[in-house]
Amino acid sequence: MSRICELTGKGRQVGNNVSHANNRTKRTFLPNLQNVTLISDALGKGVTLRVSTHGLRSVEHVGGLDNWLLKTKNEKLSTRALKVKREVAKKLAAA
């Protein structure tokens, strides 16, 4: 399982540990990923995704999973999130 947020595409970054003597050693910065069940209002069920805490706050800020998926570009979303996005769009078009 890769360490990438399924909603924002946020992944690992590479940088340096810098000691007091200014010695630099390579290190990775991993995103804070959580397995979360987000409720879709349009589908009426929960969707389990692996989301960064930043992504979780962004979803809540926009007003829920459905709004987030419809406003986000497809390139940023994982295949699982794209599948949910298509289901939500189909459900909203039928309503």
Curated annotation (Swiss-Prot):
Q: Which Gene3D superfamilies match?
A: Ribosomal protein L28/L24
One GO cellular component term of this record is: cytosolic large ribosomal subunit
| Domain of life of the organism encoding this protein | Bacteria
According to the record, the signal peptide region is: none
Name any Gene Ontology BP term. translation
- State the UniProt keywords alphabetically: Ribonucleoprotein, Ribosomal protein
Q: From the UniProt record, which GO molecular function terms apply?
A: structural constituent of ribosome
Q: Which InterPro entries match?
A: Ribosomal_bL28, Ribosomal_bL28/bL31-like_sf, Ribosomal_bL28_bact-type, Ribosomal_bL28_sf
Q: Which family does it belong to?
A: Belongs to the bacterial ribosomal protein bL28 family.
Q: PANTHER family, from UniProt?
A: 39S RIBOSOMAL PROTEIN L28, MITOCHONDRIAL, LARGE RIBOSOMAL SUBUNIT PROTEIN BL28M
Name this polypeptide is given? Large ribosomal subunit protein bL28
